[in-house]
Swiss-Prot record:
<dbReference type="Pfam" id="PF04356">
    <property type="entry name" value="DUF489"/>
</dbReference>
<keyword id="KW-0963">Cytoplasm</keyword>
<protein>
    <recommendedName>
        <fullName>High frequency lysogenization protein HflD homolog</fullName>
    </recommendedName>
</protein>
<comment type="similarity">
    <text>Belongs to the HflD family.</text>
</comment>
<dbReference type="InterPro" id="IPR035932">
    <property type="entry name" value="HflD-like_sf"/>
</dbReference>
<keyword id="KW-0472">Membrane</keyword>
<dbReference type="InterPro" id="IPR007451">
    <property type="entry name" value="HflD"/>
</dbReference>
<dbReference type="GO" id="GO:0005886">
    <property type="term" value="C:plasma membrane"/>
</dbReference>
<dbReference type="GO" id="GO:0005737">
    <property type="term" value="C:cytoplasm"/>
</dbReference>
<keyword id="KW-1003">Cell membrane</keyword>
<keyword id="KW-0997">Cell inner membrane</keyword>
Length: 205
């Protein structure tokens, strides 16, 4: 498949964007609003004609592409990003082996799509609904992802909802990554190629 590396890079940047936003919300209580919008919209794009359609445009993955290129390193922040990525991808692997959970996830996302006829995706109630999907469907599969940040920030319900909604987006992107042929070996042996592809994409944004 000629576009395999492109598709894998786009999907992996989607996961990176979700975890970078989790890190921002957990520390500060706010995050890049455009990137947040892209990540949440990705959850409801369940029947795309191509990989990029899940996110809209390459420019809407700028945060994720930047994270892919320079955010996964040995600094405390980079180690945290790596931990979130590994945890999300391990959860997705467990999810993919659970037909019941996959079916439930599909049903719940369809319900969100129907609610979009009446509500904005970024209303507090809708973010809460997305968070509850993560809590009800993904969390029980385990193990739980330990999110670290500012305690006073993480104690606020609205921030907890944002974090869980973003983790759900990360799972959705991990599903996409697998659908376009992404495998664990690509993270070990093919990361350099993804970084090169991400640098090309960033240069033209």
């Amino acid at each position: 498949m000629a576009n395999a590396i492109y598709d894998r890079t786009i999907a992996f940047a989607g996961i990176c964007q979700a975890v970078a936003l989790v890190q921002q919300v957990a520390k500060n209580g706010y995050c890049d609003s455009d990137a947040f919008e892209t990540s949440l919209k990705a959850i409801t794009c369940t029947n795309p004609s191509n990989t990029l359609e899940v996110f809209g445009h390459e420019s809407q993955l700028k945060l994720g592409l930047e994270c892919l290129v320079k955010g996964i390193d040995s600094t405390p922040s980079g180690s945290e990003i790596t931990r979130y990525l590994i945890s999300l991808m391990a959860l997705e692997r467990k999810l993919s082996g659970r037909r019941d959970a996959m079916s439930q996830l599909g049903d719940r996302i369809q319900m969100i799509e129907r609610q979009l006829d009446h509500f904005d995706l970024f209303d507090d109630q809708m973010i809460s609904n997305l968070a509850s999907i993560y809590l009800d469907v993904i969390s029980p599969i385990g193990p739980r992802i330990q999110v670290t940040g500012t305690p006073a920030v993480l104690q606020q319900t609205a921030n907890q909802h944002k974090v869980r909604a973003l983790l759900l987006s990360g799972i959705r992107c991990a599903v996409l990554w697998r659908q376009v042929g992404g495998r664990r070996r690509h993270l070990i042996f093919g990361r350099k190629k993804m970084i090169e592809q991400a640098q090309i994409l960033l240069a033209r944004i």
